[in-house]
Amino acid sequence: ILSDMRALAPDCIVADSMAIWGKLIAQKLGIPFVSSTTTFAFNRYSAGMMKQSPVRFLRMLCSMPKIGREIKRLQAAGYSVKNVLDIIQNDDSTDTIVYTSPEFQPYSDTFSADHYAFVGPSVRPAETRMEKPRQPLVYISLGTVVNDHPSFYRQCIAALADSPCRVILSVGEQVSPADLGALSQNVEAHSQVDQIAVLQVADVFLTHCGMNSVNEALYFGVPLVMFPQTPEQGGVCTRVLQLGAGVKLEKPDAV
């Protein structure tokens, strides 16, 4: 990559915050770098919101020797890396674009206004148009990655069957709607839907708390019922709770 970048001779590199090689190569070439951050900006203050389970923490500790070896390899190649935090943590000297608002970003006042731009989410137009139903609309989705939870979907279906609500489930590609059993007349299940179109008319969104989904729901003013699946999603959930924009399901059977 470094040889390719030298041949390209860019004036600036803009890279996702998780594409750590972008920042390292910019430093190596002595050119400006801009970090593009699609999650919350991460520093020692906001880190506490990304709560790790004991199992995840143990896995992280077990991986530390390998991380240490990789850092030493980078240092030997002339890259300026002190420790793992240099790689994963935002700093006050890097120009950074964050795709959320300062109101939603935890501890936004601890990030340098000279280097951080909280520009808000970029919400695309809906591909289709939905009419607002007469009855309240409940939208349920666990996103596109960690969504293989047919038992959870069945619990939602059972809880909301024959209720005075219309229910739309987006179950992803890992679960077939046909495997969810018989649906009552007020419930429909799909592998995917136009989420923007649904959120424009939804009254409640049961979500996994992915950053994109939450940003879109907040944009359209839809209250959230949250069922986070990962530490990052747990951090988003915590922030939504702090702002009073949603409630959390503590257990799957709490639906």
Report each predicted region and the residues it spans.
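Nucleotide-activated sugar donor-binding and catalytic core shared by glycosyltransferases
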Residues: 7, 12, 34, 47-100, ...
